[in-house]
Amino acid sequence: MEDGDEVVEPIEPESEDIVNLTKRLGVDLVLESNDDWKIQEIGFDGVERYLQPETFTDHVGKLARKVEWTKLVGTKSPYENSKVDPEDELDDENVAKGGLNEELVTPEAGPWSSVAKYLHESLNQLNSLLDVISVTKSTDYMKALTVLDPITVQEPTPETISTNRGTQWIWKRRALQEAVQVLDMAQKQRQRASSNLGLSADYMAHLQRTKFFEELREMREIWRVRKVGDYICGDLSYHIFGWKYDTPAIFDISRRSLSNNMENLSIIEVSVPKDLARRSMLAVSIVQDDIQSGNGLFRDPKDKKYTYSYRESDSEKVKLLHWKDSLKWAQNTLLLRDVFKTICTDAIKLRNRLSIIRDNVLLIHLFDDYLLRFELQWFPFQTGEIKEEGDIYLNRVLREMIIGFECTKFIRPQFFCSMPVTHLPEALDLRGCGGFNTAQIEERAVRSRSILQRMLDVASHRALVTMVSDVAERVSRISLDPTVQYRWLNCGRTTSRMMFNMTSKDFEMYIGTISSVRSVFFANISSDGVEVETKDGIKMKCQRDPARVMYACQYAMCCYSVTMVSTMSRNNNWVTPFQTMCANVFALDERGNPAPNIVLCNQAATRSILFVFHVGMEPEVFVRRFIVNEETMKPEEHEWKKLCYSRLHGATLCRKIDALLVFLRDH
Amino acid sequence: MGVTWVFEAEQTAKSVERLLESIGGDLHGTFIVDVTPFNPPTPSSDYPSNVVMHHSKCPQSTFSICPKDTFKKSPKAVCDRGFDLILSKLSSGLIADNAGKIEIIGNEYSLYKDWMIRVGTATQGTTVKGVVVEIEYDPSIIVIQCKDMMIEFVKSVFNKYHETLPEIFKITEKPESYTALDTMWQYLGIATKLRKKT
């Protein structure tokens, strides 16, 4: 109920009475001028007492009184409706809400039903309008235009024209037409050429051009070529990382005008820088500095053999060379020149080693009397074979080191998250966070060694290896029993290992697994010196002296001989073997030199045999009567009698031992 | 880098140096340790203060410890020297307290190659606060291995300070590695004590 100018009270069809009333056509209208409260009474003093209008609850109460409740609910039903069986409700007539009734009564729509219908419709229309607006606002399906907006046709912008598919097709067609024209022209020319057999000037020029470009392409497979304006130039420098196309190392490329008598020359003419117009070679060798080689170490200043340099008079000859050769030689010259310069600079920095540089020859002290010699040789810039001088192995190693140096990145590349360019090795990256102290930082800061230092190591090792193979050859040649065989176990650039194997022919069956300790020994070679090592781990340092190496090998042979004697005396097929009384591998002779010895005794205990093996000399054999009782012995009866070794029966040591043991078995 | 024991000495640095030279120590060089507290601009209990330290033994490192009640609860970190530069950018949260900075400068002696003893004078600003001795046993980084030997060493050389052990010696029972941060924790404790001293 709303207060307004017109107070309308529609009738609510709640009770039965009201439904049965006749349908009225009009509506009760009560017009009041304002919504003053009704005056109940006016007091004598002029105070008006108002009749308070009904509140909602009052109004509901008034209506509720009009309803005949007993008719609705029924007298029999209990107060609480919830326990009532829903079936019972059907007995009541016209229950207010939700009741099934046989008599279907069309509900009266009421006087405002059409208004409601129109309002509902307009509400629906508004809802759909709202939907449309929201759709247009959030999507691109429709664009809202005001009534006054002119409808413009969008002109195609240059962008849209270019991305338009139609235009692209047009361009493709135009390009294809151009290609067709070119091919047509080519076809015509080819026909003309085939009919003329290619003698027109045009065709010759065309041939030359194609030939030029083909050869240029060949050249570009190996060399860096660049076009600057109208000139084509190439680069002779060999660095992978660093500046390229540096002025001193570029060569010009031009087209040679072919005339008829130069058929075998290439159409590309290159002009190599004049100072690189020679062939070079860097020879490395190990030389000995003694009186005889005095003048041979350096070059004779009057000798012109390796000192070629470019002269203007040679320019014609140079022009006749094929670019493949001349560029290769020129780059090699550049490379070797730079390497020699670097090596000389490094040599000057090495303060502890003496070095002399003169006339493109560098001599640096290796060890003892030996020097390492680097010589840069120049040869004329023409075809022909150049004899390789110096030690071929060292030449190759030097070449490999140069290339390895060029390929090594000393600066770490930048990574995905940009990191600073740094020289420090990766192992030092966490030196701050790891709390490394100074000693640890130094340890991890591995610095690269120069080529010269590495060459020195390799060359000294090579000299020592040559020396040891020499000694091994001598040892194996002179020793008859035991026979010594040697082989390389490990050959490296700065360390190698050689194994010596000793055997006695015809007596191998006596060598069991026990004796393998004595029958094998090794020589370890580093770049500083040689060390002879026995299988049970005893090392004999031989520095760089070949005599000492020989001595060590011979000592090992003596130890082996002792073992042979003891093995043979035990494993004899004779019924009565000999007894080893004592054996000493570390014994010394009167002069203090090592002389392993062994004393045997026969089974009958009548004789003692003493073998003394001196290093590098014939063994000595002594015999005496066996001392039965130390206290009662008479020294003159038990003197050692030396036997003449060379007159013993048998060719080798083992055979002599065999024969001797047989003889002394029972005597 | 070995197990280290840092303590405050009650004698002058010179007397300690003379003592070391008498038992055969060789002067190795100089060292410097500095301890700088960093505080928030307005003192508050929510934001704790941080202490940044450097030690010349680890020249590329910076140590940062936020001291709380116990050793295990204090956040500690080792970083490279760039940390100092970063800290200057964080001046809205942490400001260096240069008045409270303590520097320990002195000499280091090496004894028979295994022991490194550093003796330094601790100064705060211009006032000298005390003398600090650091004993490092290089070969071992396991505390329980060399704890007893170090106590014996201190007893035999100084005869005075061997009773108060550093915290790390007391709390470590298992064979754990000793790190540079443990040394700096000891320095932190000593620096705090020195700051309170007048």
Curated annotation (Swiss-Prot), chain A:
GO cellular component: core mediator complex; mediator complex
Any Gene Ontology biological process: regulation of transcription by RNA polymerase II
InterPro entries: Mediator_Med17 (IPR019313)
A single MF term (Gene Ontology): transcription coregulator activity
Keywords: Activator, Coiled coil, Developmental protein, Nucleus, Transcription, Transcription regulation
The keyword Coiled coil is assigned to this record: yes
Subcellular location: Nucleus
Keyword Transcription regulation assigned: yes
Coiled coil: 172-197
Family: Belongs to the Mediator complex subunit 17 family.
Subunit structure: Component of the Mediator complex.
Role of this protein: Component of the Mediator complex, a coactivator involved in regulated gene transcription of nearly all RNA polymerase II-dependent genes. Mediator functions as a bridge to convey information from gene-specific regulatory proteins to the basal RNA polymerase II transcription machinery. Mediator is recruited to promoters by direct interactions with regulatory proteins and serves as a scaffold for the assembly of a functional preinitiation complex with RNA polymerase II and the general transcription factors.
Protein's UniProt name: Mediator of RNA polymerase II transcription subunit 17
Organism: Caenorhabditis elegans
Gene that produces this protein: mdt-17
From Swiss-Prot, chain B:
Keyword Transcription: yes
Localization, UniProt: Nucleus
Gene Ontology molecular function: transcription coactivator activity
One GO term (biological process): regulation of transcription by RNA polymerase II
Gene Ontology cellular component terms for the protein in this record: mediator complex
Keywords, alphabetical: Activator, Developmental protein, Nucleus, Transcription, Transcription regulation
Location (main, coarse): nucleus
Domain of life: Eukaryota
A Pfam family it matches: Med20
InterPro entries, per database record: Mediator_Med20
Family in the record: Belongs to the Mediator complex subunit 20 family.
Complexes and interactors: Component of the Mediator complex.
Function: Component of the Mediator complex, a coactivator involved in the regulated transcription of nearly all RNA polymerase II-dependent genes. Mediator functions as a bridge to convey information from gene-specific regulatory proteins to the basal RNA polymerase II transcription machinery. Mediator is recruited to promoters by direct interactions with regulatory proteins and serves as a scaffold for the assembly of a functional preinitiation complex with RNA polymerase II and the general transcription factors.
Protein's name according to its UniProt entry: Mediator of RNA polymerase II transcription subunit 20
Organism lineage: Eukaryota, Metazoa, Ecdysozoa, Nematoda, Chromadorea
Gene: mdt-20
